[in-house]
Amino acid sequence: MAIIRKTHPLAKIINSAFIDLPAPSNISSWWNMGSLLGLCLIAQIITGLFLAMHYVSDINSAFSSVAHICRDVNYGWLIRNFHANGASLFFICIYLHIARGLYYGSYLYTETWNMGVILLLLTMMTAFVGYVLPWGQMSFWGATVITNLLSAIPYIGDTLVQWIWGGFSVDKPTLTRFFAFHFILPFAIAAASLVHIVFLHETGSNNPVGINSDADQIPFHPYFTFKDLLGFIILLLIIIMLALLSPNLLNDPGNFTPANPLITPPHIKPEWYFLFAYAILRSIPNKLGGVLALLFSILILMLVPLLHTSKIRSATFRPLFKITLWILAADVLILTWIGGQPVEDPYIIIGQAASILYFLIFLVLMPLSGWLENKMLNRD
């Protein structure tokens, strides 16, 4: 008798992707991040759907509707806390996923890597428009400041900003369209994730030693399904603890005040997961230069495969590259800290130094470390 998972047209696809998929036997817990991102995306879509049932995208009612969800809707407070903190965990998993890709040389699967960068941009866009929806002070002013950056684009900038706003300032049309974008983009992310997985399955997964693993592979199920399940349990424990014990730990207190166009907050800042990019944006005094630096701080990831000079793939056997990556990790943490500080000395100069170092690592230190390691390997 034929096994249905191997013969049914739909089951066959699932079987080849999640059950009989040959996977390297030595992939570590760093390879759990992809499945955790899938879990985060599903959780965000489900909680977001329930929130959308009660949310009102009108500037007079948006703030009150969020309060209504938390006070009057059955378990509304829990759904809202899950959704808000789920975004933070989503980005933690994304950054760890990217870090793993950089560390183990997974970026050499260029199509998968570039699709991942597009996914990162889509996710950042979704999170940004979502942050505007509660219509608190930080939502309103964050939307005003970030959308205003587009006015730096020569010739079409001002027209583009007014087109996005739907008027001459951030107002009712802006909120309505941001809600529409926030609803549709996660489905675009889900579709792009499938493309990401298709590209990955063309080449097969990388592994910690960065060599061909064809000779030593095991089926994805049961080995990695159970390994992923452990990751799921840990992630769910973290989000439950966050949502129940400290739901506002990662929120900005400014967003507990309804949006007021007449009062500018003393310090406008985005959510913590955008602070590193925000610090790079602020470190350049020129508006257009800042916008380009902000964009390039993400798009520079697409250059990583092109700037790979080493004969070895994984950082496991690359001491200089390892040091470079840990400097990058420290630099991103410094930028995150600077992004949350006011624009005054000594933060300005620290931010500028950290921003220069960020680009220097990608454009100079990474290729240089590979070149030096090749020299070391070629010694008699």
Curated annotation (Swiss-Prot):
Its cofactor is heme b. It is a multi-pass membrane protein. Heme b b562 binds at residues 83, 182. A ubiquinone binds at residue 201. Binds 2 heme b groups non-covalently. It is found in: Mitochondrion inner membrane. One of its GO terms (biological process) is mitochondrial electron transport, ubiquinol to cytochrome c. One of its GO terms (cellular component) is mitochondrial inner membrane. Heme b b566 binds at residues 97, 196. The keyword Metal-binding applies. The chain crosses the membrane at residues 33-53, 77-98, 113-133, 178-198, 226-246, 288-308, 320-340, 347-367. InterPro entries: Cyt_b/b6_C, Cyt_b/b6_C_sf, Cyt_b/b6_N, Cytb/b6-like_sf, Cytochrome_b, Cytochrome_b_C_euk/bac, Cytochrome_b_N_euk/bac, Di-haem_cyt_TM. Keywords: Electron transport, Heme, Iron, Membrane, Metal-binding, Mitochondrion, Mitochondrion inner membrane, Respiratory chain, Transmembrane, Transmembrane helix, Transport, Ubiquinone. It holds the Pfam family Cytochrom_B_C. GO terms for molecular function: metal ion binding; ubiquinol-cytochrome-c reductase activity. Its main location: mitochondrion. Component of the ubiquinol-cytochrome c reductase complex (complex III or cytochrome b-c1 complex) that is part of the mitochondrial respiratory chain. The b-c1 complex mediates electron transfer from ubiquinol to cytochrome c. Contributes to the generation of a proton gradient across the mitochondrial membrane that is then used for ATP synthesis. Belongs to the cytochrome b family. Heme 1 (or BL or b562) is low-potential and absorbs at about 562 nm, and heme 2 (or BH or b566) is high-potential and absorbs at about 566 nm. This is Cytochrome b. It comes from Polypterus ornatipinnis (Ornate bichir).
